[in-house]
């Protein structure tokens, strides 16, 4: 009996060691902290989930991806990009307006009525345009912030408001329209006779309720995903004046710290989320 008990004890100890060594063998060698200033009903969150699942599976667990949604790590584009630069954030998704403070040239994506369709936009963003933008951002951030890819976040921008139907430019007069802190969207709103009002994205719902702003320029999926109709948003003009580019940024040091095969997994992960 004693021999049997001892045998069981040795077996259990051996199994325990094997289990521990298995866990150690599959522990992640790299952790990516990724964030989006949205909620779990937003397509940006969906993109992060696709990225996480792809990267963790394709790397056989060598890379772990932690998701932080909303304002857990940062609340504004400039703050979030600074986090990417200093390494407290590894991956961040922004609109062109959200990144314009650090990289003003990304506002080219907000030029009104520049691209006619999804097909045109996708062809533009899959070629030299994005590679050139990546090189420019690396140079301007002292090689700290890498643009990984440009996808879409919410379709096409449309004007929407809480006050009245907009059928021609004159109907925009006097409306307080939410913008980001960027010259191009603010100048567009001014040109239409409205008043540009910079408001952080997480504060927009409350700003509609309180009347701080009376309109915005967003895609239908953002409007519905953030439940803006519940805050009083009633009128949408489907003018599709700008393609809503999603700029995916990554801390360059974290990216380059990985062996080349894992870098490719990360690159493929960004391709998968588009």
Question: Predicted segments — roles?
Answer:
Residues 123-136:
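Signature of the catalytic double-stranded beta-helix
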Residues 27-121, 138-274:
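N-terminal secretory/targeting leader peptides
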Residues 1-12:
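Bacterial N-terminal signal peptides that target proteins for export
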Residues 10, 22, 130-133, 184:
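Transmembrane alpha-helix boundary/anchor motif
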Residues 18-27:
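Sec/Tat signal peptide C-region and signal peptidase I cleavage site
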């Amino acid at each position: 009996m004693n021999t049997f008990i001892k045998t069981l004890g040795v077996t259990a100890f051996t199994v325990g060691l094997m289990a521990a060594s298995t866990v150690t063998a599959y522990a992640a060698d790299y952790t990516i902290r990724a964030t989006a200033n949205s909620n779990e009903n937003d397509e940006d969150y969906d993109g992060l989930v696709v990225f996480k699942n792809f990267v963790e599976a394709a790397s056989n667990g060598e890379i772990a991806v932690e998701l932080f949604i909303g304002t857990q790590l940062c609340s504004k584009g400039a703050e979030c990009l600074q986090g990417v630069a200093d390494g407290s954030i590894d991956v961040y998704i922004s609109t062109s307006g959200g990144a314009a403070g650090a990289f003003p040239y990304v506002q080219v994506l907000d030029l009104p009525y520049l691209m006619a369709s999804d097909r045109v936009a996708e062809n533009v963003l899959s070629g030299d345009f994005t590679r050139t933008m990546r090189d420019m951002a690396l140079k301007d951030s002292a090689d700290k912030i890498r643009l990984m890819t440009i996808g879409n976040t919410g379709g096409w921008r449309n004007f929407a408001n809480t006050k009245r139907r907009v059928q021609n430019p004159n109907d925009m007069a006097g409306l307080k329209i939410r913008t980001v802190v960027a010259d191009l969207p603010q100048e567009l709103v001014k040109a239409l006779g409205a008043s540009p009002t910079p408001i952080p994205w997480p504060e927009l719902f409350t700003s509609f309720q309180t009347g701080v702003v009376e309109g915005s320029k967003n895609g239908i999926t953002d409007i519905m995903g953030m439940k803006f109709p519940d805050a009083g948003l009633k009128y949408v003009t489907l003018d599709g004046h700008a393609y809503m580019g999603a700029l995916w940024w990554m801390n360059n040091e974290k990216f380059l710290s990985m062996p080349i095969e894992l870098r490719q997994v990360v690159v493929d992960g960004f391709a998968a989320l588009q």
